[in-house]
């Protein structure tokens, strides 16, 4: 019964009820308005002996000192257990301007035990084009904790080698945007669907007073993912136009019948439109249990024999009772789960049954294994 309730609960959460309108901004994004990934390499200093002595960390440390006019003899090997080499990455949201700040994540790339208590020195964050878009620096917040004893025993909570700096990067260069380059905007659906694209275009035309029959069209579906919308050229008018447009509500097309299985976690999500063709199923399990026991044999107290330890293997074979159940045409989600649950099938068994039904062509829906 727990399996039935769990699957029905998850399905009710993720499946949008039929007839529920949603805003355009929740289902689509404007083409060209996107975040950009930034990455950099730097040094964290001030660690309480939890740093590292990796060759690349030492080389980076020498380079940093050289930039400050300090030269170390090549024969000297500095002890830098309070320094760690790190990778720094951040997301640069659209339209942010120089002088604004963004959060950064700092991750150890060497053998550092922890970044707690460290400070990131000035690190250039570059984009895919190799240009510097932001500079990161500051003290980190590390949620993880680690401690190690002299005998090698240690305890680690969460991840002490990853930290975060809120507003830790200062933007130095804005990313060019194509928001004003054309006489139109392109809306990209988060989940491409031809029916939804047409409904979206029809909704925009209707709400903005377009008349496709007379050749006056504002929104045109391009493909399953994109809808092109005519927009004002003036900056102020375009912003106001998009602010109004993204709050229009419409009813997207029903999602295709789909079953998603995560074989690693045992999670199964079944869409409400999944149906079954007539099919009969039997599913049973053969369980083999092997256990090892050690038996000690003591010699006679007056004898000259030795104590002998022998291994004893116990093999137990259990064949579960199998039951066959039959599906009539058009069986729904509720009936499918209830029937499988009544025969005592675990989530792993349900996965095997669904895969077998798909192979047999009796499953009217797409089976996705992730």
Curated annotation (Swiss-Prot):
BP GO terms, sorted: bacterial-type flagellum-dependent cell motility
Signal peptide region: 1-21
Pfam (any one): FlgI
GO cellular component: bacterial-type flagellum basal body, distal rod, P ring; outer membrane-bounded periplasmic space
The keyword Endoplasmic reticulum belongs to this UniProt entry's keyword annotation: no
Xref: InterPro entries: Flag_FlgI (IPR001782)
Keyword annotations of the record: Bacterial flagellum, Periplasm, Signal
GO molecular function terms noted in the UniProt entry: structural molecule activity
Compartments it resides in: Periplasm; Bacterial flagellum basal body
Main location per the UniProt record: periplasm
PANTHER family: FLAGELLAR P-RING PERIPLASMIC PROTEIN FLGI, FLAGELLAR P-RING PROTEIN
Protein family per UniProt: Belongs to the FlgI family.
Subunit field text: The basal body constitutes a major portion of the flagellar organelle and consists of four rings (L,P,S, and M) mounted on a central rod.
Function: Assembles around the rod to form the L-ring and probably protects the motor/basal body from shearing forces during rotation.
Record protein name field: Flagellar P-ring protein
Name of the gene encoding the protein in the UniProt record: flgI
